[in-house]
Curated annotation (Swiss-Prot):
Name of the protein in question: S-adenosylmethionine:tRNA ribosyltransferase-isomerase
GO cellular component, one term: cytoplasm
Role: Transfers and isomerizes the ribose moiety from AdoMet to the 7-aminomethyl group of 7-deazaguanine (preQ1-tRNA) to give epoxyqueuosine (oQ-tRNA).
Pathway participation: tRNA modification; tRNA-queuosine biosynthesis
UniProt xrefs under InterPro entries: QueA, QueA_dom1, QueA_dom2, QueA_sf
Enzyme class name: transferase
Catalytic reaction(s) noted: 7-aminomethyl-7-carbaguanosine(34) in tRNA + S-adenosyl-L-methionine = epoxyqueuosine(34) in tRNA + adenine + L-methionine + 2 H(+)
């Protein structure tokens, strides 16, 4: 497969650094399978769906997983080192995989202090620049420490242009987020849903269901040849309960469409769908990799933001709609100056 067909040039000024205010005022590009493109707003969403259609949200919660700490000087001839840490994945009660900068100034056994009573020891260094951190707290105490001292882990294309702040605590967390905080990135299509929009969704007779997928940093990593040769992506934990699976199958059998809100919800549905399109309850990791030519079994439409060029997510939307149509839609979005990525505008894909 030629990965160059999934590349496109995006002007940097179209990368949104803050969400629209209010968030349901973002623009919405409606993409029909016959090639029609309609410029709308997110609040128009109910107009393009049918009574009984089911919006499927990812209810994961984002951890304030970005930390600033200090590695004390090792001797009188050296200095303390300021360290930026981004937690990636929980590995045990106190153990977390993380990315740390400056990695070259760190070694096994180093202690990093984030606040009084909150620290971690480097248990080991891993390939790809990751480190394994052994924290001095776990469970609810760890979550409380992150809430007190961590910042929201903004995507790299935002973080390199501005630091996270208190506003991101509100705007980078969906209203569906459950209590299980384990994601290091938000399911960003869900950020557009305000109480006002949710009321309009309900008034239009649309249904809502939730699934859960904990989003990892792999969502921002570039595709590599091994992903194609192995037909696998990074693993992410996901869950669909038996009750939700039954309701989704019943809705579809009655003629309703399943409309995942975001690629993480779509990956969850597709990873739990059989060849007949029936959705099965499941809990555990998935490394599903959807690309053009792969069957899409459980997704009838998709609401999603605009994705990075050359990314697995742009390949996913191309699997649903076709590569040529998605390239045309993105070209239109760029020409019309839609805002891209996590805090940007959205599109509604109707095959």
């Amino acid at each position: 497969m030629d990965l160059s067909v999934f590349q496109f040039d995006l002007p940097e000024d179209l990368i949104a650094l803050r969400p629209a205010q209010p968030q349901d005022a973002a623009r919405l590009l409606v993409v029909h399978g016959d090639g029609r493109l309609i410029d709308a707003t997110v609040r128009d969403l109910p107009k393009y769906l049918n009574t009984g259609d089911v919006l499927v949200f990812n209810d994961t919660r984002v951890l304030p997983a970005a930390l600033k700490g200090v590695r004390p000087a090792r001797d009188g001839a050296s200095r303390d080192v300021e360290v930026d840490v981004n937690l990636v994945e929980r590995q045990g009660d106190c153990l977390w995989l993380a990315l740390a900068r400056p990695g070259r100034r760190l070694k096994d056994g180093d202690e990093i202090f984030f606040a009084e009573g909150f620290s971690a020891r480097i248990a080991s260094r891993r390939e790809g620049g990751e480190i394994l951190l052994d924290f001095n707290c776990e469970g609810e105490a760890m979550i409380a420490a992150l809430d007190a001292h961590g910042a929201m882990p903004l995507p790299p294309y935002i973080a390199r242009r501005r630091p996270a702040d208190a506003e991101d605590r509100e705007t980078y967390q969906t209203r569906f987020a459950g209590e299980d905080a384990a994601s290091v990135a938000a399911p960003t299509a869900g950020l557009h849903f305000t109480p006002r929009l949710l009321a309009e969704v309900e008034a239009a007779g649309l249904k809502r269901e939730t699934v859960r997928l904990h989003v990892g940093l792999g969502t921002f990593k570039p595709l590599e040849d091994r992903h194609l040769s192995e037909n696998r992506l990074h693993e992410e934990w996901r869950r669909i309960t038996p009750e939700v699976a039954d309701r989704l199958n019943a809705a579809r059998a009655a003629g309703a469409r399943l409309v995942p809100v975001g690629t993480t919800a779509m990956r969850t549905l597709e990873s739990c769908a059989g060849e007949d399109g029936q959705i099965h309850a499941a809990t555990g990791p998935t490394d599903i990799f959807l690309k053009p030519g792969d069957p899409v079994r459980a997704t009838d439409a998709l609401m999603t933001n605009f994705h990075l060029p050359g990314s697995s997510l742009f390949m996913l939307v191309s699997a649903l709609m076709g590569t040529s149509l998605m390239r045309a839609a993105y070209a239109h979005a760029i020409e019309e100056k839609y805002r891209f990525y996590s805090y940007g505008d959205a599109c509604l894909l109707l095959p």
